[in-house]
Amino acid sequence: MAKLGKRTRAAREAVAGKSDLTVEEAVALIKANATSKFDETVEIAMCLGVDPRHADQMVRGVVSLPNGTGKTVRVAVFARGPKAEEAQAAGADIVGAEDLMETIQSGKIEFDRCIATPDMMPIVGRLGKILGPRNLMPNPKVGTVTMDVKAAVEAAKGGEVQFKAEKAGVVHAGVGKASFDEAKLVENVRAFVDAVSKAKPSGAKGSYMKKIALSSTMGPGVTVAVDSATGN
């Protein structure tokens, strides 16, 4: 087994034995241990009491974090005519129709969010096996299949975060950068947790939020008391 670097070892020792912290305590600890040369992303992982293999237990949604993500989001838009022009004016990075489909089919995926007007879905539908596993498939439930292209592009660029439960019932996302003020990270964490709480599906039984953890890109994770994150 490879030896741990001094920085990694120190970070792990700093969080050893610490669990069920308040959001404020966890954020302070994460920031203190984010010592890489780049601005690490602060990430949240939530273990939910759901089985997303069942349709009535799927957790999916979108939330606009009050302080943004600190990430530059690249947006692709499937649109034609005036709507394509609207997307470009709103700041979309890539705009197209069949040409964009062919680019994606060739394996070139240079975007973080994909938006489409409803009339484009027959084309976009052919890309399901490529975009679906990457959580990039446009979906009306999260506002990425829409005629209001301008609003969708601006939301994506402005700190909107999509979330979806994975097979094990885990939802994860970036909620800011380690360089953010502690108060701003705390706000973002609580906004994300609140959105996941409101997305509780009808088929969820028993305890819904089982565990919440925060970490930075290169740092160890710490568990957060669910009550602290939800404000209960």
UniProtKB/Swiss-Prot annotation:
UniProt cross-references to Pfam families, sorted A to Z: Ribosomal_L1
Sample GO molecular function, one term: tRNA binding
Residue spans crossing the bilayer: none
Keywords from the UniProt entry: Repressor, Ribonucleoprotein, Ribosomal protein, RNA-binding, rRNA-binding, Translation regulation, tRNA-binding
One CC-aspect GO term: cytosolic large ribosomal subunit
Cross-referenced CDD domains: Ribosomal_L1
Highest taxon in the source lineage: Bacteria
HAMAP family: Ribosomal_uL1_B (MF_01318_B)
Function: Binds directly to 23S rRNA. The L1 stalk is quite mobile in the ribosome, and is involved in E site tRNA release.
NCBIfam families recorded: rplA_bact (TIGR01169)
Record's subunit section: Part of the 50S ribosomal subunit.
Name of the featured protein: Large ribosomal subunit protein uL1
Species the sequence originates in: Dinoroseobacter shibae (strain DSM 16493 / NCIMB 14021 / DFL 12)
Lineage, highest ranks first: Bacteria, Pseudomonadati, Pseudomonadota, Alphaproteobacteria, Rhodobacterales
